[in-house]
Design a protein with these regions (language model features):
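Ligand-binding loop in jelly-roll beta-barrel domains
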Residues: 99-124
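A short, N-terminal "cap"/entry segment at the start of jelly-roll beta-barrel domains
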Residues: 2-46, 93-96, 126-131
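Extracytoplasmic low-complexity repetitive segments enriched in small/polar residues
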Residues: 35, 54, 77, 92, ...
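N-terminal targeting signals for Sec/Tat export/insertion, comprising classic cleavable signal peptides
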Residues: 33-65, 107
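Structural recognition of the beta-strand scaffold that forms the well-ordered cores
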Residues: 60, 69-70, 94-95, 113-116
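Short acidic-glycine-tyrosine-enriched beta hairpin
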Residues: 37, 52-53, 81-99
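Short beta-strand His + acidic residue motifs that chelate non-heme Fe in jelly-roll/DSBH
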Residues: 60, 78-79, 95, 101-108
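Glycine- and acidic-residue-biased ligand/ion/polar-headgroup-sensing regions
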Residues: 64-82, 91
């Protein structure tokens, strides 16, 4: 009986693990590929595309590693207390380890599309949200 209950518990935990991992992610992000970084134990490289519609917000956050990428499709964005500014197509993205960034709202006119590559600590959440 104890073995059966243990098996049910393990199955329930395994089922819920993806839900917990997704709760730490951005709903606008679609992961394209994830691989271990050769020659650097404990590091991985993750490529993603994120699409934000007008009205979507990207909360302030940081990563446990470096984020690089570019703006595929630009849009106007607004940081709290700041006038709107353009994130232009082709603009580079480079955010250093543990440095908070983001915190803007997309105001349009179209969607903002970002391609990013994260080189981060394996096993840590990709995003840590910052208040």
């Amino acid at each position: 009986m104890i073995l059966r209950r243990s098996g049910i518990f393990v199955a329930a935990v395994a089922f819920l693990m993806p839900i917990v991992a997704q709760a730490q992610d951005s709903p606008q992000r679609k992961e394209l590929r994830r691989v271990d970084l050769s020659g650097a134990a404990g590091m991985e490289v993750i490529s993603s595309i994120s699409e934000f519609k007008p009205g979507d917000e990207l909360p302030r956050h940081l990563h446990h590693g470096v984020e690089a990428g570019y703006v595929v499709q630009g849009a106007m964005v607004q940081n709290p207390g700041q006038p709107p500014s353009m994130l232009a197509a082709g603009a580079p993205i480079l955010n250093l380890r543990d440095v908070a960034h983001g915190g803007f709202k997309v105001i349009g006119p179209g969607n903002l599309i970002l391609f990013t590559v994260h080189t981060v600590d394996k096993g840590k959440p990709l995003y840590d949200w910052v208040k």
